[in-house]
Amino acid sequence: MKNAVAYLIFSIFFLFIESEAYSQCCSAGNPVSGDGQQKSINKNQLRIYWSFKHSYSDQYFFKNKKEDIPFIDNSRFNYSSLQATYGVSKKWNIQTELGYFFDKSQTVEIPEKYVFKGFGIGDLGITTKYQILSLIKPQSELVGSFGVKIPVGKFDQDMDGAMLPISLQPSTGAMKYNIGLYYSRVNLNNKWSFYSFLFAEYSSLIQSDFFYYKYGNYYSLALFGKYKLTNRIYTVLQLRQEFRDKDKRENDEKIESTGSKVTYMAPQILYNFYESWYLLAQADVPLYKYVNGHQLTNKYSFSFGVHKTLNLHKKSSE
């Protein structure tokens, strides 16, 4: 009975705030992963990358100002993914990625504290990358990419018989298509490296028994500086600008409290602990946030991972 009352109040609350305070802090689908350095690999090489990410949000914003809303305490997720990249040829790479949400939850006060939780497999990402340009002097590379995200995970997840909101579903429920452009340059002294990328993603319309929804387009621009401290330790500083268009529902109606502009600073450290094995850790800190309407925004996130590049050609020839 207690759970039933809680969900009734929660459902009414969500209907009330949908046009005023829609949460985009942990929207459905996979977080952007990877170490941010999208250099291509050679033919018959295989790069495996495992990562874990934690994100926490407890700050409501109206436009670019923080405000207090007493109902939602926080939203968070814990997500792990496995990514594999294979060198099909000297210029072509193909990449796949699949992840799992161990915890995608929201804590609310209605008036007692309740935690609503989603979990499960996210979206399957498949990306092809092409090396457009490669120079020896200066040592630099330009790579283009095209990818799709397929909603293989659960999108109609409920909790004790009550359907979870779209922001807590482990999958997006929509096909997504993305393009990217990545540039890297290494200085002659091999101490400094510079990277940049442009990324854009388009989402198809969701039409299910429970949701009629379309996520807004997503755009990202990032600049990286990488410095070699020792033979095994590297530091990276990333500045990233993210743009999200407004989401839409029936009759192509835009949802006012969706869409944002956020600037992040992301320090990172990489440790080459054995041959081509690397450990990495990264924090994402919002420097500036501007949202449409009232939105629950990200306070911080951090991630860590390990990646290894294998030379399959050598192994097969032995």
Describe the residue ranges of each PLM region.
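Residues on the lipid-exposed face of transmembrane beta-strands in outer-membrane beta-barrel proteins
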Residues: 50, 82-86, 126-130, 146-148, ...
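Residues that define the transmembrane beta-barrel architecture of outer-membrane proteins
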Residues: 44, 76-80, 118-124, 140, ...
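Outer-membrane pore/translocation modules
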Residues: 103-199, 203-211
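Outer membrane beta-barrel transmembrane domains
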Residues: 59-63, 67-70, 212-318
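Transmembrane beta-strands of outer-membrane beta-barrel pores
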Residues: 52-58, 98-104, 132, 148-154, ...
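Outer-membrane beta-barrel biogenesis signature
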Residues: 19-60, 137, 143, 311-318
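Outer-membrane beta-barrel strand-turn architecture
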Residues: 42, 88-92, 132-138, 185-189, ...
